[in-house]
C-alpha cells in the first residue's frame, strides 16, 4: 500500500498522458483515420487495424487510473474524508468505466445503440465522464473556500470547457444541428477530454509538490 501511495502521482500522470495520446499515436497506423471527424472508440472496432493495441492500451491506462486513486485518497483525506472519497472514487470509476471496459468489450462497427455490448460501453463511459467532472467541481469549490481565486478559476474553466465541448460532441446526434458538427465530432470529444484531464494532472503535481516539503 505504501508503494502505491508513493507512486500515485506517477501512475496518474502516465494514465492521463497515455490515454490522451493513445488515439494520436495509433491513428498514424490506421489508414484514413481522421482525428477531427472520427471518435476515439473507432480505434477499438473490429475493422480497426490497431484494435488489439488500442484495447490493451485502454486496459493499461484504466489500471493506472485505478492504482493512482489510493494515493489521491490519502492526499485529500487530511482535508476532508468526503472530498477524498468522491475524488478518488471518480478516478476509479473513470478508469474502470471509460478505459478498462473500453479495452475489454469488443464492439462491432455495425452494432446499433441498443446492442448490449454497445449500450453497456456507452452507458459506463457516460457515467464515468460525469463522475470525472465532479473532480474540477469539488476542487473549484474547495479553492473558493480557501480564497484561492486563481486556482478556483482554473478548475471552473476546466469544468465549463469540458461540459461545453461534451455538449458539442453529443449534439452530433441531434437533428439539424448534427449535420453541422459532423466534420468536428472527433475534435470536440478530444477537447472535452483535454479539459477533463487537466484537473487530474494538477492533482498529481500537487502530490509531488507536497512530498518535496
Q: Which ranges hold each PLM region?
A:
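Hydrophobic, aromatic-enriched alpha-helical segments typical of multi-pass transmembrane helices
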Residues: 3-33, 39, 43, 47-198, ...
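Short, Lys/Arg-enriched, Gly/Pro-containing loop segments at transmembrane-helix junctions
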Residues: 211-213
Amino acid at each position: 500500500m505504501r508503494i502505491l501511495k508513493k507512486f500515485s502521482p506517477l501512475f496518474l500522470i502516465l494514465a492521463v498522458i497515455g490515454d490522451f495520446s493513445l488515439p494520436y499515436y495509433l491513428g498514424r497506423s490506421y489508414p484514413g483515420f481522421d482525428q477531427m471527424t472520427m471518435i476515439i472508440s473507432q480505434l477499438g472496432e473490429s475493422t480497426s487495424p490497431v484494435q488489439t493495441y488500442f484495447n490493451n492500451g485502454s486496459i493499461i491506462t484504466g489500471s493506472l487510473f485505478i492504482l493512482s486513486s489510493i494515493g489521491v485518497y490519502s492526499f485529500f483525506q487530511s482535508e476532508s474524508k468526503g472530498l477524498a472519497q468522491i475524488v478518488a472514487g471518480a478516478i476509479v470509476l473513470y478508469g474502470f468505466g471509460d478505459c478498462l471496459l473500453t479495452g475489454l468489450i469488443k464492439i462491432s462497427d455495425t452494432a446499433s445503440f441498443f446492442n448490449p455490448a454497445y449500450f453497456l460501453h456507452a452507458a459506463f463511459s457516460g457515467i464515468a465522464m460525469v463522475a470525472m467532472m465532479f473532480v474540477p467541481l469539488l476542487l473549484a469549490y474547495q479553492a473558493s473556500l480557501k480564497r484561492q481565486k486563481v486556482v478556483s478559476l482554473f478548475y471552473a474553466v476546466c469544468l465549463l470547457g469540458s461540459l461545453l465541448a461534451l455538449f458539442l460532441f453529443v449534439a452530433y446526434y441531434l437533428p439539424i444541428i448534427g449535420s453541422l458538427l459532423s466534420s468536428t465530432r472527433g475534435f470536440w470529444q478530444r477537447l472535452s477530454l483535454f479539459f477533463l484531464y487537466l484537473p487530474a494532472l494538477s492533482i498529481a503535481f500537487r502530490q509531488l509538490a507536497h512530498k518535496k516539503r
